[in-house]
Amino acid sequence: MMPTLAPPSVLSAPQRRCQILLTLFQPGLTATTATFSELNGVDDDIASLDISETGQEILRYHQLTLTAGYDGSYRVEGTVLNQRLCLFHWLRRGFRLCPSFITSHFTPALKSELKRRGIARNFYDDTNLQA
């Protein structure tokens, strides 16, 4: 009897890591290995490997650490400046590697958080941003 193999993810490793990091920066979202596994269409082992590689990359380039909480959720820790620089860097990568993720997941979450906080709509309204 042949073991059942999961089909490979349609996303490359850099795309998966980009989506992992941008998910960690989404406001109000608790991200676990299961979250990343479902998001990227991979099993938990590959998701764990991607999380580890993402953590190594942000440590090397941005002096940030990726820590796991007691409930299995992950978060990015470091100075506010390093976190912002990291976010901008990965947003640029995201626009190149996985633009559909940014438009369908990241942007709506960010807009709803800005609305919830009472930020003036003209800062995030699509009509004004197109001008």
Show where each model-derived region lies.
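Inter-domain helical "communication" segments and dimerization helices
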Residues: 1-131
